[in-house]
Amino acid sequence: MHSSIEEMYDFQDKGGRHLALRPEQTASVVRAFAEHRPNIPWKAWYTGPNFRYERAQKGRLRQFSQVGVEALGTEDPYLDVEVMALAWRFYERLGLSQIKLEINSLGNKDDRVLFI
């Protein structure tokens, strides 16, 4: 598995500035949360193009759009339910009717120790 840095388009522009195209958006949201310490729980949404420097393959393009929501700063499971309900309504409003929701859980800290 490659890191986002390895998959990042980076280059110098005509002015000699070093630029990079974002490979995904979650890291930027988490960084903003860590730097600005907003009130919690903190909810954010984003949408936009992303770029990955990798061999193009079926279902994995170099440029793609990402829509996402993040809810940070709490372990309240109701916030997870809120995010799932938001996604469900989003797909419904797009007119998608053949949606199947499968829910799984990593468990809590004690549960995960059993799988290490």
Task: Identify the role of each PLM range.
Residues 1-116:
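TRNA-recognition modules of translation machinery and tRNA-sensing kinases, especially anticodon-binding
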